[in-house]
């Protein structure tokens, strides 16, 4: 991984009055570019081949310029071009997937957030340690398939976007479905409602929901639309579907907005606070947007089953603000909140605290 000292040395050569916000043209790029423009930043889209035409349909979110590459890994070879643009890169899920973790960690361009959190987020053992040390409720895990005594969800390592999962109601069904030779995690299947909670942690802002250092925002909540799990049971029972050779899948195709019972908000902020404070102890802390993927049971308890330590696609629902972010600032999106953090850090001479 490129060192923080090397990144700060590169940043020292920037014209800070002319910072460019850059990201890969995918995932949440429309929101990121739109938010950056709202805060007065120049924007730069990184794409493979010709610039995507769909940006022409969304002029308020079309980047001011593009860098066209032959492959995403070519970003490392083109880092000097990005540096010449005074670029700060905003990572998102697609960028990390396309570029690869090792290449992302080595990219010699100032990047918003703490790159060290990626190792903790992407490794299921480390992620679980993080959550357990934070003291939040997590699903029970089975180390041995012989111990399965309830419905479970099985996640292959590296699963993302709803792929790489299956549900088994007992150990016999697990044995019939498991793909040998792949690493996997077995968790109890929690009955409840899924809430994907969008947070933003600022280590430099003082006004708001205070932590030991900085503040925590809760900007929105969504749930995922999954194909074909959200529609499949309209055509028959589980047994009828299995008899016909039809099985549920969980590929994410979209997102729906949600609001919580107001009485649950203290629990939400407690979850976010615990995860942030523990991240500071473990690896120096997350910076910026992150999401806790949770299930709320009928006892109104939260079970946290995953962390995404960057902007998530569910925030795209709220480009013009959410029921929660509107109570912070009218029309505030996560993309704009990122740009605001960079602008604030620049004005304070504290960019080193929010980039890596």
Curated annotation (Swiss-Prot):
NCBIfam families: PRK13278.1-6
Gene: purP
Superkingdom classification of source: Archaea
Pathway: Purine metabolism; IMP biosynthesis via de novo pathway; 5-formamido-1-(5-phospho-D-ribosyl)imidazole-4-carboxamide from 5-amino-1-(5-phospho-D-ribosyl)imidazole-4-carboxamide (formate route): step 1/1
Protein family: Belongs to the phosphohexose mutase family.
Protein name, per record: 5-formaminoimidazole-4-carboxamide-1-(beta)-D-ribofuranosyl 5'-monophosphate synthetase
Free-text comment on the cofactor: Binds 1 Mg(2+) or Mn(2+) ion per subunit.
Names of the cofactor(s): Mg(2+); Mn(2+)
Location of the ATP-grasp domain: 116-333
Organism (species): Methanothrix thermoacetophila (strain DSM 6194 / JCM 14653 / NBRC 101360 / PT)
Chemical reaction(s) catalysed: 5-amino-1-(5-phospho-beta-D-ribosyl)imidazole-4-carboxamide + formate + ATP = 5-formamido-1-(5-phospho-D-ribosyl)imidazole-4-carboxamide + ADP + phosphate
InterPro entries: ATP-grasp, ATP_grasp_subdomain_1, IMP_biosynth_PurP, IMP_biosynth_PurP_C, IMP_biosynth_PurP_N, PreATP-grasp_dom_sf
Binding site for Mg(2+): 293, 306
